[in-house]
Amino acid sequence: TLPHLLATRAAAGEGSNILTGKSVVMLNLQGGPTHIETFDPKMTAPSEYRAMFGETKTTLPGVTFGSHFPMLGKLAHKMAVVRSFKHGNGSHGSAAALVAAGGNPTKACMGSLYARLAGLNNAETGLPNNTLVVPAAMGKRYKDLNAVPSRITSTGDLPKAYQAFDPSTGSNILNDMQLNLPDGRFEDRRGLLQRLDELKRYADNGGIAGASEFEQQAFEVILGGVSKVFDLSDEDPRWMERYDTGHIKIPKGLPKKKKNGKAIPGFSPEALGKQMMMARRLCESGCGFVTVTNTGWDMHGNAFGVDDGMPILGPAVDKAASAFIEDCEARGLSEKILLVITGEFGRTPRINNKGGRDHWGRLCTLAFAGGGLKMGQVIGRSDKTASSPASDLVTNNMLLGTVMHTLFDIPN
């Protein structure tokens, strides 16, 4: 039962609570985002290496981002950008899994590790502690948008129970949260609603005053409507507009020009703003680890190249991620939520003959915001062509350590 679950979780944590109460949002740019056109434009390099669209100034003296990140540039003093992140793997599946796991020996993604240590559900709200937000989670209109969650949500050697909760799958968990019943069971539905109404009146009249702490908590979870977290309709329209990426469209003729053009419509970033808003809501309600996916970053030129992909995906990430940072600050959550922006690897320093860049594991995209970390800094630097780290190498294990120290109060 739910009261038993809550009591068990509390007992397990008595005297040994190592949780910091913070959350992590991992924005995973699937396909391998170019490190050059994002956070390391290298405009002093030869033309075939430097950022294709130039650079934009930031609030940090002498630091520039790629030209499609002007909003993030204005928030650079609230970010920590890494220009020396390297793991050496240039294969999609294994590199994505490596980054998602932070190289830990169980090969479980960091969200699963968190759930293993913190529990499957938040002890107070009942919300899953490890949640995946793909475009389809934002509604049926986004069901055809691409996502490859299997690469970044492996439980490795841990039990499958620690798999990320995916609200887009129509799982029984979300249905239970929403108290749905199949069509045709009207009498059962009416009976259930009547019983819930009676239960609410009973609670309102103080009838649960004598219940155990965990029975009361269970009442609050059921009657409080945990599923409301997944409904954006009560959000301030001004913030909805600030996050919104629905206006960013793929040019109609672009897919026909490409060898693998049929894949391009699935890369639309129109849901990304809503995904990031959902991530904030989840963290605000107690979810400890949220993974947000955004695809299309494999910019060889067969589908998207850097030349035609960055003008679409870049502004979407810029708007959604900057809105997330500003929203967290407005709500007093900046110290409580760590945003991590990364992908499976970077892209080749030299632009290819299709207007794209190919796989490159020797330098990768990585940036942070919030979480109580030191912001307003650039960590490490790349060499003159953004081919490899030139100082302060950052590894997968360091990424894992940063995330785990944010989530847990543990020694080095």
Explain the meaning of each model-derived region.
Residues 1-412:
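Ligand-binding pockets and gating/stacking loops
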